[in-house]
Amino acid sequence: KLLGGTTREVQAGADFGIQDSFDMLLGNIQTAIDTGFPRVKLKVAREWDVEMLRAVRSAFPNEKFHIDCNSGYTLDDLDMFKKIDKFNLEFIEQPLANDDIIDHAELARSIGTPICLDESVTGPRVVEQALKIDACKFVNIKPGRVGGLTNAVRIHDICQDVGVPVWVGGMLESAVGS
């Protein structure tokens, strides 16, 4: 209430990094689904993208997935992004360099899967610029990265005004006092 919240429940998802094998990943995803997680985020990297997604989609044809590229690709990888369009992902998180929203806009125009910005989201002005050029359809807000709660709420409001979904990601700081 203090921050203007309108809901009492927040859905959480399960996140999986690169695993030792597809079988290990599929087992971990099954455990997350059995536990009740409504969606799963998969980290991807070169050599752990198209074939991994093919295995995941084959095993879980109806589950909600999105991928996080952690800025690991470039526009030169457009053919790979076009291949993963067929896997019916909710979105692709931070596919390109965090300081290049122009390339994100170009990628967004070239593929069917929506783009989510994460590392690029450093403050309200960047978000306004990204939305103006259609660089993304989702925004991940990390209060520690954007300058605290005031800026996080500003970014939320900017996105809400244009119908772009947001969520609050990690990087939540804490400290141990003496």
Where do the language-model regions lie?
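N-terminal small/glycine-rich loop or linker at the start of catalytic domains
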Residues: L2-D20, M52, P61-N62
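Short, flexible, glycine/charge-rich loop motifs used to bind or transfer phosphoryl groups or to couple energy/partner
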Residues: L2-L3, Q30, K82, Q129
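Short, solvent-exposed beta-strand edge segments and adjacent coil->beta transition regions
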Residues: E9-Q11, F37-R39, F138
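Active-site glycine-rich loop that binds ribose-phosphate moieties when present
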Residues: D23-N28
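Catalytic domains of carbohydrate-active enzymes, especially glycoside hydrolases
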Residues: T31-K43
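Catalytic core of soluble alpha/beta enzymes
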Residues: L42, E47-G177
